[in-house]
UniProtKB/Swiss-Prot annotation:
EC main group: oxidoreductase
Cofactor binding comment, as recorded: Binds 1 heme group per subunit.
Protein name per UniProt: Tryptophan 2,3-dioxygenase
Known catalytic reactions: L-tryptophan + O2 = N-formyl-L-kynurenine
SUPFAM superfamilies referenced in this protein's UniProt entry, alphabetically: Indolic compounds 2,3-dioxygenase-like
EC nos: 1.13.11.11
GO annotation, biological process: L-tryptophan catabolic process to acetyl-CoA; L-tryptophan catabolic process to kynurenine
Cysteine disulfide partners in this protein: none
The organism of origin for this protein: Burkholderia pseudomallei (strain K96243)
Family: Belongs to the tryptophan 2,3-dioxygenase family.
Length: 306
């Protein structure tokens, strides 16, 4: 009840013109007029639906467990969704590469930030797979054959674009000529970081000619002229703001990539221990060795120098 003499309580701005002053009492859930969906389109016989737009039928029909074990569905979906996230990461990285070549850095910043968020999604996905116990994995492992995430061609392209080049990693894809050719082109092209170093040179930093004309099929190696350029950027960030922001986007990206690798190792150790991987690698020891790979070395070295 409103005390005498007080002004009327303000009406809710979202209420209708004839809304009562009394508190609103929700209608029964079955009342179509209040359900919120009564004007939604319900007939899609002549138009595109949500499932049509997303091609959900082939996506949801792509899980084909080979074992009778209940947990294999988790294993399949974990890896399929990871491949979809990697597809997006590659899409954004290719666009970022093109923007950097064109000196259009603000769009590249957005794309690189998105890749870092994709990698965070991939890190969290390991938490779902980690609900699988060693005994559950052992029940389905014989059905995997020699298939292994080591053979993921999208992951290999991701490594190549980020600068971890290794021509031997083309061999698992020799039986698929189109994929092999695509990966070989990525191996021979400048990496993301190579393009950023070319950007440093275009902005007037004295980068060694041999670094600008390197063998792109080799993994990234530390270069003192590149570190000197980044040192100048970090010492005067306001004078080189775009390059400073680029450096931090790259550090964010590698940090997220390292976390993804680390979570992969710990999940493998949790589920299979130190058994050999299905693809023939040493398993967890191989994955631990990959933790030592540094994608953008000068950006980490410069932090010690500052």
């Amino acid at each position: 009840m409103q005390p005498p003499g007080d002004d009327a309580a303000p009406r809710c701005p979202f209420a209708g013109a004839h809304a009562p002053d009394a508190p609103h009492v929700p209608e029964a859930a079955g009342d179509d007029a209040q359900a919120g969906w009564h004007r939604a389109q319900l007939d899609f016989s002549q138009s595109m639906s949500y499932g049509d737009y997303l091609s959900l039928d082939p996506i949801l029909d792509a899980q084909h467990p080979r074992s009778p074990d209940h947990n294999e569905m988790l294993f399949i979906i974990q890896h399929q969704t990871s491949e979809l996230w990697m597809k997006l990461a590659l899409y954004e990285l290719r666009a970022a590469l093109a923007s950097i070549r064109d000196d259009a850095l603000p769009p590249a910043f957005k794309m690189l930030a998105r890749v870092s968020r994709v990698l965070e999604q991939l890190v969290q996905a390991w938490n779902v797979l980690a609900t699988m116990t060693p005994s559950e994995y052992s029940a389905m492992r014989p059905y995997l054959g020699a298939s292994s995430g080591f053979q993921s061609y999208q992951y290999r392209e991701l490594e190549f674009i980020l600068g971890n080049k290794n021509a031997q990693m083309l061999r698992p894809h020799a039986h698929r000529p189109a994929i092999h050719a695509h990966l070989e082109a990525s191996l021979q092209a400048p990496s993301l970081y190579d393009e950023v170093i070319r950007l440093l040179a275009r902005r007037g930093f004295p980068i060694a000619p041999e670094r600008l004309d390197a063998d792109w099929t080799q993994p990234t190696r530390h270069d003192r002229t590149v570190e000197a350029a980044w040192l100048a950027v970090y010492r005067e960030p306001n004078a080189h703001w775009e390059l400073y922001e680029m450096a931090e986007e790259l550090v964010d990206l590698e940090d997220a990539f390292r976390q993804w690798r680390f979570r992969h190792v710990t999940t493998v150790e949790r589920i299979i221990g130190f058994k050999q991987g299905t693809g023939g690698t040493s398993g967890a020891p191989y994955l631990r060795k990959m933790l030592d790979v540094v994608l953008f070395p000068e950006l980490w070295h410069v932090r010690t120098t500052l």
